[in-house]
Structures are given as C-alpha cells and as structure tokens.
Design a protein with these regions (language model features):
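N-terminal secretory signal peptides that target proteins for export/translocation
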Residues: 1-12
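Non-Sec secretion/translocation targeting segments of pathogen effectors
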Residues: 1-2, 26, 30-32
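Bacterial N-terminal signal peptides
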Residues: 13-29
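N-terminal pro-sequences and low-complexity stem/linker regions of secreted or lumenal proteins
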Residues: 33-690
Length: 690
C-alpha cells in the first residue's frame, strides 16, 4: 500500500453502565409514529455457530508465498506453496520445478494498446533485475529512542518495541540491496530475502508496485496458458517486467530520457528492480509468531486479495463487497476530471487526468500513458492521477483486453460494471475526514484534489445496523487523526504522531456512516477503545481492526515482525478474558499481496479481481491445530461468514457475497468448478472439536 504512505507523507497525511453498545448504536434513527424512540433488540447472540464475536485484523501487503513459502504443515494436512510445488527447496534455493515460476521479459509498444498478456522472452542473461533497497537507513524513530517509540504506538507487547528502533538498511538512495546475497545474479524466479547474514527478518525491506492494471498485467492471464490445475491461465510470469517498465505509475509524465529497466548510477529507474520476487523462510525462523499460529490454530492456503492492486480498493471491497465509483456526492454517477483544471484559484490548482490509461506512451515499452496516485496537491500544483475506469465501455483504455479475456474463459465471467460508472481502481483519499466534514469539497491547501466524493454504495456496516448486530471499526491512532484531518503530524514521532490510515477505513468513504455524528461516534473508534472493550468484555459482535502505519507490516514503512507484535497483543488480551475467548474467532489477514509474487491459483470473479493469494489465519477455540483449508476465498468471504453466522442478508444485489460457495473436485480442491464462487470460511472451523 505504498500510496497510503506517499499520500500521508505528502499531507503533513464504550459501552457504559447497563446500556449496551448494541442498544445505543441501533436505537439511533428508529422511532414510533408518536415520536418515542424504540430500542431494537440486539441480535448479537443470535448466531448459527458458537461464535459470538468476530475480530478481523488487517495488515499490509504480503502474499501467502511471501510469508509461508517453506511452511510444512502438521501431520495429516497439506499445503500449496513454493516448497510443496518443488519450486524451491527448504533452504530457499531453486528446486527441481523452479521453471514453473520463471519470470519473463515482454514487449508492449505502440501502436499496440495495453496488453494483458504480451509476447514474452527470457530475461536478459536469465537473471532477475537487481532488487532495489527500501526503508530507512537507520529507523523511523529519532535517535532510535525506545521512549519515543512507546509514545508513538500503543499496539505492541513490551518486548516488540525494540523492533521499532532497529532494522534499518544501512544503505542510501535507490541502489541494489546488497544485503541480499548474490543480489546482481539472482536466478529468474523467487528468491529468499534472508539468504545471507546481513538481511535479517527484522530488516526493513523494499515495497513493489501494487496498482490495478499493473497487477492484471503481472498475472499474465490468457486462456492459452490454461491447464487442468490452472484453468484461468494466469501464469504470473511478468512481475519484475511490470515493476521495471512502469512501476507505481507515471502521472501522465513523459518517460525520462535516461530511463532504464536495469540499475546504473546514471540511469532513471522505477526504484524497484525485482523486489516482487522476495520471500521469507519460516523454517529458518522468519515470521515465528505467524508460524506458531498456523501450527496451533487454522489457516487457509487459498485466500485472495479481492481486487487487483492496492490498499484503498481492497479495503473498499472488503467493507462493501463491491467497488465504489465517482459521483456527484449525492449518489448519482458522474465523470471524474479528465484533462481539466481543478481547484482553480487555489494553491492546488492544476490540470489533472483522473481517468486511467494504461496504453503505452509513444516510443516506450509499457510506460503507461496516464496512471498514478496523483502529483502535487497539498499546497502544490496538481497533475496526473489516473485511477478511475469506466469498465462498462470497451472503448475506454485498458477495458477491452480484460473484458475479452473474461469472456473467453470456459465459464465466461461478467465484468459487473454498471453503465456510466467510473470505478475507483487505486488509492484516493476518502470523501470524509474523521470529524465528518466533506473532504472532497474542502479547499484547504493542505488537502488533496485526489479525493473521491462521498459514496452511497451500501456496506456491511449498514447491513449490520439494519439487522441489529453491533460492530465497530477500530483504527489505530484515530484519536490523533480526528483533530488532524490533513495529517500534518504524520511522521511526527511522539505522542501526537498521526499514522492512522484513512484510505483503509471502508466506512470513511460512506455518507451513511460518516454523515451522522452519532453513528460515526458509535462505530468508528481508536484501538485504545479496542483494548478497553476486550478487558471489560464489552466487545461488539463484529470488530474490524487496523494498525497504524508504524506497525501494519507494510514493506519499507513497516516490517512484518511489527505486524506480528500488533496481532499478538490482541490475541493475548482476548485470551486473558476467558468469557470472551470461549466464543471468539480472530481473523488475521492482509489487505493485499503488495505486489509480491505468489504461485497460487487466481480465479477471475469480475473486472476488479481476484488478485494474488494472501495469508488468512483464524485463531479460535473452535479451530483444529494446524488445519489448512483449501476452499477458494477472498476478503468478501469474511462478509459471507458474518452474514451466515448472524443470519444477515447480502450487502446488495450486486455485491460479491451473492456468489455461491465453491464446489471443487477431490483431485483439485483449489479450483471451483462453479466459478465465480467464494467460500464462507466455515471449513476453517471444527465446531464439534471444542
């Protein structure tokens, strides 16, 4: 989710007494004809399973293979990963089937438009472009002060704070990451990050591109590639090629004359190299806490990010089961700014083009014409910003190759794009600030024009409110963010640091939640409230938890061990309350794969995704130690579990939670024969086991 951090950096970006939260939050707006306020009965305990509390913890930007490449399951279980496929050996070196993951070079040049699966060739010299370093040279905490670290973040166990002040790269600038052994001569496939003595599990690492059209192209989907085990034909062969030809977008700028896909001191590069191909090795002690949880609880090896691309779009799909679109802010579709001046008369004035165009620019190989998070704003001239697509119109850039591919599948897939709707494919700031003010119409110089108008698309929050099931979104550092809407205290390490993730809160886009002060206060709170609710036993039925940018595990700006620590604190606190623990399920996942390679099957569901596999671990008394579920699932499967458990209807008639549970064959449990289909995650539990 690089865009979150880029945007935020630029921005400088209880229950009480005898009244339950459910009664408080659900009584709002409900009344009898005589004006008396009703108190609807809570349905929190009206469940289909013994689970009365669901906690969803969402980290940042890791694929399944990136973490669990070498995981060996407990006896009686099987797993699909780089090791089991023979792509690598237990020591992380290439295995006998390494060619299955071989990465390729390709060509997409004018007059060709965007190619979903361009003609490929071997990488030069049959080696990867050198992965480039990322993260701080030292640490993000001044003078590596433990005291400052503890003031800045309250979401870690005491023994994890040392990780906040260690792990710097020791490198300066975008150069090959020499901490990686053999960095300039890596074979053309997955490689272990921690393959030497200088790149440890605690090291900050680089972050690869993770945008919509880039990920579609990296997956290299074509039915001519299809096999019995991979009927979608997505062979994931173009990860480094996309990284090095376009990276995280162009914002409409011309390709520099000194541009190169290979590093040299005089060249202009995308700043990534083959970062996408790195993985950790749990057999060598990497990711120890998540391995412990996988060994002692349950895990899926077929869970996916729901949208190709980045953080904002995936959190939106998680919260709504659907994508959101550009509007007039009143529920009517509209056309986003397209080569026009915006914010006229302000410091942010500039010509922007918010419509995606992944067609290669003249005289380039795959340098997208218009694609980016947006340049300038925050007090500077605005430009670029291609992040919307009208995918109902096949004449729009990038649309025809994807819709043609979807139609070519054995079970043709509908794009699910409504006419005249420009869907948000990448990260833009949400339409509301934390204080409930309209962020789209705000003209303060510290704001950004790359903000989506308030949305009317229904969410799981609306669904739960309507059905009298309590819920909260707990955002780490929310209390610091609300009085700091432009996040001027982002990176201000200390008590006021504001690394709350605004684009991660799916409800911050929505008028139904953010436009009502009472509803907003009841449902959007800080993780400080999470810890107190756990301790007091007043947790709502559904809790969604997002760490701050310091501890979310995002590559470059955070580390996986910090997200492990954030997760461990919550798990430990819940287990300290036996009354709560006995009927709780904690879902631990990522918002997306962050652009890292993964070898798992990807099922096309619509125009928006799915994307790569990501981890999903479920911690509950009702899981069997070491169980691995293979049923195909994605973020929206968590909504399906909530809906099935509390008897709640789907979010809307078009949301993905309407898809059936997958049906698969015994010899290929990963591929639904009734596509499009996603699981409700019930197979992760053994309710007769407890």
């Amino acid at each position: 989710m690089t865009a979150k951090h880029l945007a935020c950096t630029a921005m400088r970006a209880i229950r009480t007494g005898l009244v339950s939260t459910a009664i408080f939050q659900l009584a709002v707006g409900s009344s009898f004809a005589n004006g008396q306020t009703a108190t609807p009965p809570s349905r929190d305990n009206d469940t289909a399973t013994p689970i009365k509390h669901v906690i969803v913890i969402i980290g940042e930007n890791r694929t399944f293979d990136h973490i669990f490449a070498t995981y060996v399951p407990v006896k009686g279980e099987t797993v699909n990963n780089l090791l089991s496929e023979g792509i690598i050996k237990a020591d992380g070196t290439p295995g006998p089937n390494f060619p299955k993951a071989e990465q390729k070079a390709a060509s997409d040049t004018p007059p060709d438009a965007f190619l979903l699966s361009p003609t490929t060739s071997s990488l030069p010299g049959s080696v990867l472009p050198a992965p480039i370093n990322g993260g701080p040279t030292d640490s993000y905490v001044k003078n590596d002060s433990l005291s400052l670290a503890k003031q800045s973040e309250n979401g870690l166990p005491a023994d994890y704070y040392a990780y906040l002040v260690t792990g710097g790269s020791g490198l300066t600038g975008k150069v090959p990451d020499t901490r990686i052994k053999n960095v300039n001569a890596l074979p053309p496939g997955p490689f272990q990050l921690t393959n030497g003595d200088t790149f440890t599990y605690n090291s900050y690492a680089a972050s690869p591109v993770h945008r919509f059209y880039q990920m579609w192209q990296q997956l290299d989907c074509d039915v001519s590639h299809a096999t019995a085990s991979n009927p979608s034909g997505c062979d994931a062969a173009l990860f480094p090629w996309v990284e090095t030809t376009v990276g995280a977008g162009t914002n409409g700028l011309a390709q520099p004359a000194t541009f190169s896909t290979e590093y040299s001191p005089s060249a202009t590069i995308t700043g990534e190299g083959s970062t996408s191909m790195g993985f950790y090795n749990v057999q060598n002690g990497d990711a120890p806490y998540f391995k412990y949880l996988a060994d002692h609880y349950a895990m899926s090896d077929n869970f996916h990010q729901s949208v190709d691309g980045g953080t904002g779009a995936n959190h939106i799909m998680f919260g709504h089961g659907d994508a959101i679109w550009f509007s007039d802010g009143k529920g009517n579709p509209a056309t986003p700014p397209h080569n026009v001046t915006v914010a006229a008369g302000t410091a942010n004035a500039g010509v922007v083009d918010e419509v995606e165009n992944p067609n290669p620019a003249a005289k380039t190989n795959n340098w997208y014409t218009e694609d980016g998070y947006g340049g300038g704003s925050f007090g500077a001239k605005s430009y670029g910003g291609g992040s919307y697509t009208n995918c109902s119109d096949t004449t729009q850039p990038g649309v025809a190759p994807i819709t043609k591919y979807l139609a070519s599948l054995p079970n043709p897939i509908a794009p699910n794009c409504e006419a005249g709707h420009y869907y948000l494919m990448n990260n833009y700031n949400p339409g509301y600030f934390g204080n409930g003010n309209n962020a789209y119409t705000d003209t303060n110089a510290n704001n950004t024009v790359f903000t989506i108008p308030p949305s009317s698309v229904p969410s799981i929050g609306d669904d739960l409110i309507k059905n009298h099931v309590s819920w909260k979104y707990y955002g780490d550092q929310w209390n610091n963010y609300v009085p700091d809407p432009y996040q001027l205290n982002f990176n201000a390490i200390g008590k006021l640091t504001d690394e709350y993730c605004n684009i991660c809160n799916p409800f911050q886009y929505d008028t139904s939640i953010m436009g009502n002060a009472t509803v907003r206060a009841a449902h959007i709170q800080d993780t400080e409230n999470l810890y107190s609710d756990i301790k007091a036993g007043t947790l709502p039925a559904v809790s969604i938890v997002k760490p701050s940018g310091l501890v979310d595990g995002h590559p470059s700006s955070s580390k996986l061990d910090l997200f492990e620590g954030f997760t461990k604190k919550i798990v430990d606190e819940v287990k300290k309350n036996p009354t709560l623990w006995k009927d709780t399920a904690i879902f631990i996942t990522e918002d997306e794969g962050g652009g890292f390679y993964d070898s798992g099957y990807v099922q096309p569901l619509d125009y928006f995704g799915d994307g790569t596999r990501i981890p999903l671990i479920v911690v509950s008394p009702y899981t069997k130690a070491g169980h691995i579920a293979h049923d195909y699932a994605d973020h929206v499967s968590i909504l399906k579990f909530i809906e099935a458990n509390w008897g709640v209807e789907t979010v809307s008639t078009r949301s993905r939670d309407n898809y059936p549970n997958p049906i698969a064959t015994a010899d290929n449990p990963y591929v639904p024969v009734n596509s499009p289909a996603i699981d409700d995650l019930m197979s992760l539990f053994t309710f007769s086991y407890q």
